Structures are given as C-alpha cells and as structure tokens.
Amino acid sequence: MISYFLNQDFSRKKQGRMAASGPKSSGPRGFGRRTTVGSAQKRTQKKNGEKDSNATSTATNEVSGISKLPAAKVDVQKQSSVVLNERNVLDRSDIEDGSDRLDKKTTDDDDLLEQKLKLERENLRRKEIETLAAENLARGDRMFVYPVIVKPDEDIEVFLNRNLSTLNNEPDVLIMGAFNEWRWKSFTRRLEKTWIHEDWLSCLLHIPKEAYKMDFVFFNGQSVYDNNDSKDFCVEIKGGMDKVDFENFLLEEKLREQEKLAKEEAERERQKEEKRRIEAQKAAIEADRAQAKAETQKRRELLQPAIKKAVVSAENVWYIEPSDFKAEDTVKLYYNKRSGPLTNSKELWLHGGFNNWVDGLSIVVKLVNAELKDVDPKSGNWWFAEVVVPGGALVIDWVFADGPPKGAFLYDNNGYQDFHALVPQKLPEELYWLEEENMIFRKLQEDRRLKEEVMRAKMEKTARLKAETKERTLKKFLLSQKDVVYTEPLEIQAGNPVTVLYNPANTVLNGKPEVWFRGSFNRWTHRLGPLPPQKMEATDDESSHVKTTAKVPLDAYMMDFVFSEKEDGGIFDNKNGLDYHLPVVGGISKEPPLHIVHIAVEMAPIAKVGGLGDVVTSLSRAVQELNHNVDIVFPKYDCIKHNFVKDLQFNRSYHWGGTEIKVWHGKVEGLSVYFLDPQNGLFQRGCVYGCADDAGRFGFFCHAALEFLLQGGFHPDILHCHDWSSAPVSWLFKDHYTQYGLIKTRIVFTIHNLEFGANAIGKAMTFADKATTVSPTYAKEVAGNSVISAHLYKFHGIINGIDPDIWDPYNDNFIPVPYTSENVVEGKRAAKEELQNRLGLKSADFPVVGIITRLTHQKGIHLIKHAIWRTLERNGQVVLLGSAPDPRIQNDFVNLANQLHSSHGDRARLVLTYDEPLSHLIYAGADFILVPSIFEPCGLTQLIAMRYGAVPVVRKTGGLFDTVFDVDHDKERAQAQVLEPNGFSFDGADAPGVDYALNRAISAWYDGREWFNSLCKTVMEQDWSWNRPALEYLELYHSARK
C-alpha cells in the first residue's frame, strides 16, 4: 500500500508540473498560470460571478492531483480579455509586473509541494530499506538489493553489511560484477556508508535492458574478496530478456559487428585497389610514354635516309603541281612513262606511302594520260595521278607499277631507291616529332585501355561462371540425396526454421513403425548442445517420407543429424558412420578451418608422372578455396620444374636419419609447399621413379616428413598420404609420433592405382583412420582384394575432379576461339578447322574422333585400333595423341601410323608423343573422345573432354561408369545424380562392344546435328571439377576426427 501511494503521489506531481508548464495562451504574459494556485483561482472566479464552492473545489482538486487545469485556463483567458476590454487603460508594464509576481508565487508553491512529496517518498524509501536491512540481519544475510524485485533498465541499490562480511576490517569496499553469467557490461563501484546502523554500505547501479541476471562479488580493491563462499552473488532480473533471448541478442550484435567490420574491410580493400589502380595507371603512362619516345626516335632515324634522298622533282621523270604544298593538300603527281621500264605498259599505278613508308602502303591510285599540248611527244609521255598528301607527311614515298597491288608485274622503283618527294610546307621538324610522339602515346594508351577492358570483362565473366557452377553443384549435391533426405527450404538459413524430410524406405530403417530425428549444429559442437529427440511425422502426400521441423540458430554453419527407430536408440541410420551434414547459410559463425597436410611424391605441375600428381594439387586447391589450411610436404627432386615454384626460400634445417635435411618453402599453384632436401643425395637422381631403391628412398622421405612436422611444431588435423609411395606415413605415425603431442591428428590414405605396391597399400589400410580410392565403382571392383576386404568399413570411393582453371576453353591460349556453352558450336568449329590444318587433314565437315592416352594394355589398345578403322569406315576422321612406355607397342603404332598415312592420309593422324598444346586443341576440335580402358580407377580424359564439349565414348568400368551416362540407357541413373545423360558407353572388351557405342555416336552426329549440338552444350555445363569431390573429402576428414 505504501508503494502504491508513493507511486500515486509521484504521478500526481508529474501531472501537476506538466499542466503548470503547458503552453501559454495568446493573452498577456502571466495570466495563464494563475490557475495553479487555489487562492488566486478563487479571486478570479468571484470577479466573474462564479460560486465560492466551485473555487474551493477547484483548488482542492489541484492539490490532490486531479487535473482540471485546461478548463480553468480557459476561464482565466476569458477574464483576461474582459479586464482589458473594460479598463482599456491598463499600462502594459503594470500588467507584466503583476504577472511576474503571480508566476513567482506559483513557482514557490510548486517547489514547496514538490519538496514535501520528495521528502515523503524518501522517508518511505528509507523505512522500507531499514525494514529489509533488519530482516536480512536477523537471517544472517549480509547483502540485499532495493527494490527487491529488480527490473531491466532501472536503478537499484546494493547493500552490504560489512560486519558480516570477510571485509569487516577493510576501510574500502568495492563491488565488482557483470550481467548474464559475467558476459555483459562489467562494472566496479565503491560502496559508501549509509544512515543504517550495523555498518551497512551501499552503492547505486543501473540495470541494462539486456540483463536477466546480475553476478557480482565484493572486494577491498586489492586481493581480499567476499565472493559468497566461492559461489559469487547473483540477483535475478524479472520482466526482461531470458537466457535464450540474450544469446540471440549477442548473436545479432555479433552479426552487426561482423557486417560493420566487413564493410570497413571492403572499404579498405577498395581503397587499396584504387591505390593499386592509380599506381598501375601511373606506371602504364610512364611505360607508354617511354615506348612512344623510343618509337619516335626509331622513326626519326629511319626517316633520315629518305629525307636525304627526297627532292621536289626529277627532271624529265616526275614533278608535282602545285610545287608548294602541305600535308592534306590534293596535288597532281606527273610521271614520264618513257623515263623508265614502264614505257610499254598499258596501265600505270602509283603505290605510295609517306615518311619512309611508316604506315606501309597507304596510297594506291591509277594514273591517267596527261595529254600535255605544250610538251614535245618525242621528249616524254606524261601521265598523272591526283594524290592527297597524308597528314603529318614530311616526305612522300612511292613507286610506279603496271597494275594495282597483288596485280602488278613490272615496277619503276627508281633503281631500287624508291621515289621520295619533300613536302615543302611542313611543320618545323622538332614540333613534328613532338606531335608524332604524342600521337603514338595516345594510340598506345587507347590500345591499352581497350585491351584492359576486354581482359576485365573476361575475368568478370570467368568469375561469374565459376561462382554459378559452384552454386549449381552444391544444389545438385543436396538434391542428389533427395531419395533419402532433403530439406525445405533446400538452402538452410540461419535463424529460420527448417523442415527435414527423410525417406526410411531407402535406408536401414525401412519398415520401422517409428522414426526419430536426432540433431544438432556445427558438427555436433553447438553451444546449446543436441536437440531433443523428435518423433517424425508422416507427410501430407502419399510418399514414404516423414518429416520434422527444427529452428536453426543464428550462429549455425552446419546442421547435423542421424535417425533412429526409437527415442532411446535402437537401430541408427548415420550414413555409414559419416552422419548427415547439411550446410547452413547466413549465420554469424564460420566453420573453423581444418589443417590438412599432404605427404606425397608427385605434384603437378612441378613433378608429375601420373594422375596422382594432379589429385594432390587440385584437391588441395579445392579444399583451400573452402577456407581450410593446406600444406604439402614434398621431396626436393633435382628435376623439379622450378619455374612453377614461386617465392622459394630456405626455411630451416634439421638432422635425422644420419644426415642433414634442408627445408625450403615455396608456393605452387597458390599452395604452401615444404620441400625436403636430404643431403645424402636420395633425390638427386634426375627422376621421380625408376631407381632400384625407390622403396627405401620414399620410406626415408615419409619418416623425414613426420620428423619435420614434429620438430616444426605442426599439429595438423589430417595427414593425407597417397599410394604405396607415401603409405609408410600411416604406420610410422601411429608407431612413433602419436605420443609426441600429435594425438588429434588422423590419417587418410588414398589408393590411386592398386597395380603397384600392394603390400604397402595393405599395411596402410590397416593403420589409416579412413581410406579412399578415386571412384565409387573402382572401390567396388577392388573391394574383394585381400589388402582391402578387411577394411571396407572405412573404405570410400570419391570420384576425382579436374582443375577448371587449367582446362578452360574460355581462357585457353592453345585454341583459336575461346568459347563457353553459349557458343560451343562456333568455338568447336574453329578448333576443328585449326586441328585439321595443323595436322594436314582434309578441311571438311567430318565427325572427328579424338584419342588421348598412354598406349598400354590397360587403356585397351586392341580396342583403340579397331575404333580407328571403324571410324574411317564411317567416313570420319581420327586423331590419336599418345605414346607407349613399351617399345614394342610404340613400334606397332608407328607402323600403323605409316599405314594410315598411306591409305587415309587426309582423314587419320597418329601423333606418337606427348604434346600438351595439341591435347588442348584435340579436346576442343574433336566431336568425340574415345576411352575404351579395360580398367580405369577414375580417368580424367572423359572429364576434360566434357569440359571442352566433346562427347565421351567409353567402356563401362571404374570412374568411366561413374561419370558417363549413356544417352540411351542411363537416364534414370543420371537423374539420381541430378544430371542429364552425357555420352555413349559399352560393356564388353571386344570389337562388337566398341562398335555398339561408336556407331550410335557417329550416327547421332550425322542424323541429328541439332540434337548433337545440344548434347555438346549439356556436357559442357556439367561440373566435373573438384567442387563436389572436395565437399566429400571434407566430410571424410571430419568423420575421421569424430
């Protein structure tokens, strides 16, 4: 009740003050405020004939806070008007003096009332606090707050009884605290003595609007604390945010801060870019000016001989009318036909230029007979041509001929000296050359501008196409799981709800009466922990999917989930141990980067022998582009192509294995590479493979690489080793290095080709945490191998990709016309013509079959030979590029090349060597690329072919089966991968199998050109880069660390 009256008094006072300070009327100053005092109100009302009782009522209501001021104010204003009208002689100064006296009295009365109410409130506050102090003291509680119910965005007082505290002997007592579990707005205040007995101290604090809890301790400003027996003091705050609201508030604050920092960073980058642009522009101007000076000097030097030879006429040979002319004038140049070798020519032509032919042939004009009447016919046969003197000409240069350019046979060139005429009215020479320099400079600048515009447009388009491809691939990656799980919306947004739809019919939970969803975020590490198990409900349609909905937090970057048959467990579908993970966009948190270290003995382009080198470089780049950290440890061969290594510098050295090992660091294709250079000469052999002690060399390297990581303080999340050559990393690490602080590191091992080093591969399979090979189908084909069969639970097939920057028809310097899927027909037509011209094939519209391969039995050489003859029978052209490591096979193909050159020289060409530029042209110019491998772990040829719009014709094996979907037979299989059919394939390893695919392909080219062109466009738009494989490898890396 006390609190009620206290608040009521305060509101009354507030209302009274508001009324008293309201806007004045248009009457004289002072009269509008007389209503606030009761006695003044009475006198005014009596003058207007009103009852005393009304006046008394008005005054009483005013004191009690019942506001009737607006009506009283109107009355006063009316009276003011009457007084002025009746007396009409009042002096304004008298009125103002009276007004001031009334104002002062009103203000004094208000102040007195306010002080009285303030005193009453303070007394009531003190009584309440004293009561609380006594109650807490009686209970032995040394601390309390006032008011007892603490609300956000208000002030409170904190009281401490020093006598009951561990600070009872301390002269100074301070409070130190913060809000919301010590996470928001820390504070420190000094406590002061109060009027309450028993040594109560207090201070005033403001509660922020975001607070749900206040946490604090007391201390003496140094090292003595009262922290509530190590539990800290806390006060709950009512009526504001709860913990979840505050967490979301923090996330929103962080998001705003990130946006602000991003804008600031973008502005800094813009300024840096502008600075770079200005510096580059300045350098370009200086370079162009220097080039213009040099070019001008060169022209000046070249012109001097012509100036020395130049004359105004040659007696009885030629002359010019008028004789005094300047640049851009039209003159007549006369020539005596009888003066030289053109006496008997039917036609005369002038082929000319200027300034010693600076612009080459720029004047071509036919002469006509002058028919001069005053000239003796015996002395000459004069002809003339009207010539416009070129602008800027100092000298005119010419010869005479019996026909136009490319049609003349006989010339008069002044005895091989050419004819040169001075321009009489020319600019002063220095001024002319200054103008010439400026003209050259302006042209260089314009050429540079146009070139930069083309390059900029091309770069922007390349970046746009790359981003669109990556976005499209991610969407297809998500949709490819739709037969098992997908979400609505497909793109999961942080801060929004998402519905997860699951089809148990296609999983281990098929037929189970219930399906339960278990999820979390950020790879099961989210601060809120896992979501409670949710029973999934049937969808509204008749499908076998079930669904549930979850709210995605603002700080999520990944959604994680598994499914089970019961709330408390039972059978789980966890995607074979990988769990289901879907990316979240728009969150304020980013996925912490993994640190991956590849230990390998091949790397493109510095030391590449086979596909392993491509994978190491391309996979590393793709993972790095996803914002993870990648290093590569590599032998420093003496045969490395150093021109591809940037910023190579000595890093350190260490001793191991009885020798010093020097470490160098450089960048290859934007990747961080550590080169190990043991001083025992193991890698100074001039080759990567081929030494009798290869196993020992690479075993030493693997151990040295692990020692380097240990001594260098590296703590990678993943060590990725490849094939037999770096397989020892797996067991050496587990045997010797896990106890040295590398306990969190996991081993991933990739098999590129099981043909070599089976024993080492088998041992690596045992020790690796996860193992992969280069395609799902090859993984199935080798699953029965004894070195793999015992480890299928950790063995995965992930298709390789290609590097879209290396294989890019839009930015390929080896093809005549850059192209994308938008102009694939025109681009490939130009490439085919160039290919035919370069190889001496007939330039005609033939279907071209390209074969780019190593000539080994694995690649199906007997099928290649058959395909060559079949293509020629179908009136096609064949281009083969490749060589054989086996001399017998090489000689066999040399004989075949000679035979084809004799019998089909205009339609077949075998280039039996490796030629990188030619391979690009074949991919671009061929209609089909044939890959008839007997087995193929992955295969890159068919992927590159599709990148260039060439349709693959392949045998169904390994990675060829995983990437090529037959246009007639694989529509459903392609649809499951969210792809369109993209080629022709066959099963057998014999001639009928090749014929079945090749004949259908060539017939499609002949019979349905428009459909075939659309197929070329389709295959170009499919993404066979590392975008998707990189995502799958990251899932594998995280699974290894789980």
Swiss-Prot record:
Expressed in leaves and flowers. Residues 54-63 have a biased composition (Polar residues). Residues 1-44 form a transit peptide. The keyword NAD does not apply. Residues 1-63 are annotated as: Disordered. InterPro entries: CBM25 (IPR005085), GS/SS (IPR011835), Ig-like_fold (IPR013783), Starch_synth_cat_dom (IPR013534). Transmembrane segments: none annotated. CDD domains: GT5_Glycogen_synthase_DULL1-like (cd03791). ADP-alpha-D-glucose binds at residue 608. The keyword 4Fe-4S does not apply. GO terms for biological process: amylopectin biosynthetic process; starch biosynthetic process. SUPFAM superfamilies: UDP-Glycosyltransferase/glycogen phosphorylase. Pathway: Glycan biosynthesis; starch biosynthesis. Its main location: plastid. Residues 247-302 form a coiled coil. PANTHER family: PTHR46083, STARCH SYNTHASE 3, CHLOROPLASTIC_AMYLOPLASTIC. Involved in the synthesis of glycan chains within amylopectin in leaves. May play a regulatory role in the control of starch accumulation in plastids. This is Starch synthase 3, chloroplastic/amyloplastic. The gene is SS3.
